[in-house]
């Protein structure tokens, strides 16, 4: 584990940025979307220490980059530290992330834990590694957040991840749930935030290409074919090509839930409807008014 690298001048994130108009248009869009997510869900507050989980993939690089740029212009003061979990995967290029962090004056930690061997051992033959791997990764990162005094743990999930999770739970889990933009961990010790919640994956792909991030592929799970999530993602990509507004509408639905129009008895008290109906009929004047309205409508026809 490496101690965080600090510039002698304090916060000094000044990367060499692309100069194209396409980059600045996209940057403006991403800043706006991330800013709205942070505001809508009160993700970052004055004095926060935000631990950004960096895997070396396009999503976490983009998240870290946008948050660091926000820190330069934000009206509040908050700290950012990048954390990578080195899971000891064979062939993992251990020098890539430290070099990127140091070249850009980004405080970082490398947390070394051999979760790769444990995942391989605990996963039954023929099953994917995702469940075991993610559980071990979460436990390691959440515990480390407590060690360094992080008040928020930032994850790189984007809008399309949230939608894909919704359909995974719908098709395979029998539940209506996705990934919330902000969440209290199950042990109630960490606040998890997803600042990219409003950002589309295709914009992240484009941004990562323009910024030329040193992407590290995931050889552990990326080599496994026919993952349920991969199939869902392919479905979403096809929808996006054929019906460009469909994913936007689906994500909007996740923010516009009507419990009374579903069938979850824990979410909505259906029994109270009977008492409400009886209360209405106890008022003879109210009942007379309703009948008058009905009679008028029939007369009009």
UniProtKB/Swiss-Prot annotation:
It comes from the Bacteria. One of its GO terms (molecular function) is magnesium ion binding. It is found in: Cytoplasm. Keywords: 4Fe-4S, ATP-binding, Cytoplasm, Iron, Iron-sulfur, Magnesium, Metal-binding, Nucleotide-binding, RNA-binding, Transferase, tRNA processing, tRNA-binding. Its EC number is 2.8.1.-. It catalyses: cytidine(32) in tRNA + S-sulfanyl-L-cysteinyl-[cysteine desulfurase] + AH2 + ATP = 2-thiocytidine(32) in tRNA + L-cysteinyl-[cysteine desulfurase] + A + AMP + diphosphate + H(+). GO terms for cellular component: cytoplasm. Pathway: tRNA modification. InterPro entries: Rossmann-like_a/b/a_fold, TilS/TtcA_N, tRNA_Cyd_32_2_STrfase, tRNA_thiolation_TtcA_Ctu1. Binds 1 [4Fe-4S] cluster per subunit. The cluster is chelated by three Cys residues, the fourth Fe has a free coordination site that may bind a sulfur atom transferred from the persulfide of IscS. Its cofactor is Mg(2+); [4Fe-4S] cluster. A motif (PP-loop motif) lies at residues 55-60. [4Fe-4S] cluster binds at residues 130, 133, 221. GO terms for biological process: tRNA thio-modification. Gene3D superfamilies: HUPs. The keyword Cytoplasm applies. Homodimer. NCBIfam families: PRK10696.1 (NF007972). Catalyzes the ATP-dependent 2-thiolation of cytidine in position 32 of tRNA, to form 2-thiocytidine (s(2)C32). The sulfur atoms are provided by the cysteine/cysteine desulfurase (IscS) system. Belongs to the TtcA family. The thiolation reaction likely consists of two steps: a first activation step by ATP to form an adenylated intermediate of the target base of tRNA, and a second nucleophilic substitution step of the sulfur (S) atom supplied by the hydrosulfide attached to the Fe-S cluster. This is tRNA-cytidine(32) 2-sulfurtransferase. It comes from Acinetobacter baumannii (strain AYE). The gene is ttcA.
């Amino acid at each position: 584990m490496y101690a965080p690298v600090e510039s002698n001048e304090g916060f000094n994130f000044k990367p060499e940025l692309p100069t194209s108009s396409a980059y600045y248009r996209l940057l403006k869009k991403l800043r706006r979307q991330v800013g709205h997510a942070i505001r809508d869900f009160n993700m970052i507050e004055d004095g926060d220490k935000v631990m950004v989980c960096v895997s070396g993939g396009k999503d976490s690089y983009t998240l870290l980059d946008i948050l660091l740029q926000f820190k330069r212009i934000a009206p509040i003061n908050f700290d950012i530290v990048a954390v990578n979990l080195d899971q000891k995967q064979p062939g993992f290029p251990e020098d890539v992330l430290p070099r990127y962090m140091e070249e850009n004056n980004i405080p970082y930690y490398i947390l070394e834990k051999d979760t790769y061997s444990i995942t391989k051992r605990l996963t039954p033959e023929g099953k994917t590694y995702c469940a075991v791997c993610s559980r071990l990764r979460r436990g390691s990162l959440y515990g480390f957040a407590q060690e360094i005094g992080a008040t928020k743990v930032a994850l790189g999930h984007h809008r399309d991840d949230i939608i894909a999770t919704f359909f995974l739970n719908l098709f395979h889990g029998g539940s209506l749930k996705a990934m919330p933009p902000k969440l209290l961990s199950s042990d109630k010790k960490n606040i998890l935030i997803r600042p990219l919640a409003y950002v589309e994956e295709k914009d992240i792909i484009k941004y990562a290409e323009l910024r030329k991030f040193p992407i590290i592929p995931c050889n552990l799970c990326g080599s496994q074919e026919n993952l349920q999530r991969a199939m869902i993602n392919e479905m979403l990509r096809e929808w996006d090509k054929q019906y460009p507004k469909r994913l936007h509408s689906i994500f909007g639905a996740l923010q516009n839930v009507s419990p009374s129009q579903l069938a979850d008895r824990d979410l909505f008290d259906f029994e109270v409807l009977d008492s409400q109906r009886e209360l209405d009929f106890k008022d003879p004047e109210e009942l007379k008014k309703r009948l008058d309205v009905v009679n008028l409508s029939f007369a009009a026809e």
